Amino acid sequence: MSNTPRNINDVFTRVVSVPASQIDLLSASLLIAAREYPDMDIVAERGRVALLGERVRKRLRRRHGLYDAVHAVNEVLFNDLGIRGDKKRYHDPRNSYIPNVLDRGLGNPITLSVLYVEIASRAGYRFHGIGLPGHFLVRAGEGSESIYVDPFDVGGLLSRRECIAIVQRAIGKPDRKSVPMSVDEAAPFMRPTGKRAILRRTLSNLKQIYLEKEDYARALQVAEGIRTVEPTSWHNLADLARIQTELGRFNAAAETLSTYLARAPRGHELESARAALSELRNRVIRKRESGPGTDAAGTGGPVGESPRNQ
């Protein structure tokens, strides 16, 4: 019998509807996977991560330094389990689901980083995810003692200057190679990423993947998840309205666009949004005039078979 709750969306809402610092990141991440794999056993998956943390703890024994901890996590994840960053199929959605990462041994930067942080936590160490533009790392330690780890590159260590170079390349200033970005300029990009932001970034990656595949049913699930994590995200509301329209859910799309217009910054494609809202309302009127019927049922259940190990 599965230990995954039937009302996954309700449980996910409860898990993320607390102050960001109190969010159980592993539970929330597993619930994201459970929306795709409703037969997944969340208790068992938590147990897998706990066992990995215990293996790290045993490796450390009497050693307690940060480098010792990083080395131990690296050994367990990348040597024992053989986990790697998926550089061939980077945008495979399975790379975003922790159970898939453990099953297949492949993941993307943010999911590998979440797994890294959660394993370290269960071994007694507080590491942080660092969401650089275009990449995701793990930081062990604080201030000048910080160690930067790249789980996507089998736990390779990076200097602060190498991290700054990643930021500089990502924000489009390659012309400044001869004038490197300063530590102060890069500092806002190198702060620990909050749990809510990590979840939003994970879901945003998935949303983009499904939109590119034109898999609007799955994209809808993910966009609804982002709305749960960050209800005020106007960018996600715009995407959500588009997805609802693609699925023929014109009433829902009109409501979403109305909310978007109330929240989006002035001048941000508001005229096109107003035109889209007017067209949606006309569609709703025509639909009512043509006969009974409502928008398709809401989300909440599985959106199709997607074997974890195919």
What do these predicted regions represent?
Residues M1-Q310:
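A structural boundary/capping signal
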